[in-house]
Amino acid sequence: MARMVHCVKLNKEAEGLDFPPLPGELGKKIWQSVSKEAWAGWLKHQTMLINENRLNMADTRARQYLLKQTEKYFFGEGADQASGYVPPPSA
């Protein structure tokens, strides 16, 4: 049976992640309170941030920026938006 969590991002009960996605306390916190669906949304958003901001993941500053954005996305005021991104019109 799947592990269920109350997802802080979606504000509903949903299937939890199989393992902490990051090392350390942030990874544990995400594992305990973020659903697979919300994590998939973060991965898409993270990809946009990397591409639009031309982040070099070999650069420590870029990795630190993404860690801060991860925490803001789930537990703060929301992550930065990609500078060139325009959301699709809602139907």
Swiss-Prot record:
The keyword Transport does not apply. GO terms for cellular component: cytosol. Could be a mediator in iron transactions between iron acquisition and iron-requiring processes, such as synthesis and/or repair of Fe-S clusters in biosynthetic enzymes. One of its GO terms (biological process) is cellular response to oxidative stress. GO terms for molecular function: iron ion binding. This is Probable Fe(2+)-trafficking protein. Belongs to the Fe(2+)-trafficking protein family. Keywords: Iron. Pfam families: Iron_traffic. It comes from the Bacteria.
